[in-house]
Amino acid sequence: AFDHTVEVMTAAAPPPATVLAAMESAGFAMTHVYGLTETYGPAVICAWHSEWDDLPLAEQAETKSRQGVPYHMLEDLKILDPETMDAVKPDASQLGEVMFRGNIVMKGYLKNPKATEEAFAGGWFHSGDLGVLYPDGYIQLKDRSKDIIISGGENISSIEIEDTLYRHPDVLEAAVVARPDNKWGETPCAFVTLKDTAVGVTEQNIIDFCRD
């Protein structure tokens, strides 16, 4: 741990809450941002509220793992049903696609009008990221649309499973993908690296932990 606070900005793949908690306890003050090349970099920030400082560290990490709210330069940010373009409910559970609008969003893909038309269908830039909207207006990513696992007609977030796996005290690394299944169409398949200190941890131990 450091003897002083180190300010860090994290982006790209959504960090598990356990990783954020470990970083904070080591003296890093984490700021979580989200964006794409098409939005000129970061366009969303998990703006911190002082009242959250009183939350337990684990709850602070859970709160900070959300992507957040729009930067001031962004005209609008919504989570919409990509088929109907209806807004999702702010209930932190209804899944939709994250969409952007504003002058920090690109005009289009170079010499690719078809891709540009598809990306801006309905007047919004489609990010390809799936997420939920919280009652306080903060968004949280759940998966890439191409990575979501559809099992028996249900959408399963690979990111949520990975986040659960990282909570296991003996898990060092985790990655979840879809595996073809004759009955369900797809089922989650996890690739896990255990810590060197792990003893006697089995596949069934990991499965039972996730179920609990």
Question: What name fits each language-model region?
Answer:
Residues 2-4:
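Short, conserved loop/helix-junction motifs that constitute active-site signature segments
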Residues 6-11, 15-33, 38-138, 145-148, ...:
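Conserved AMP-binding/adenylate-forming
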Residues 102, 107-108, 130-212:
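AMP-binding/adenylate-forming catalytic core of the ANL superfamily
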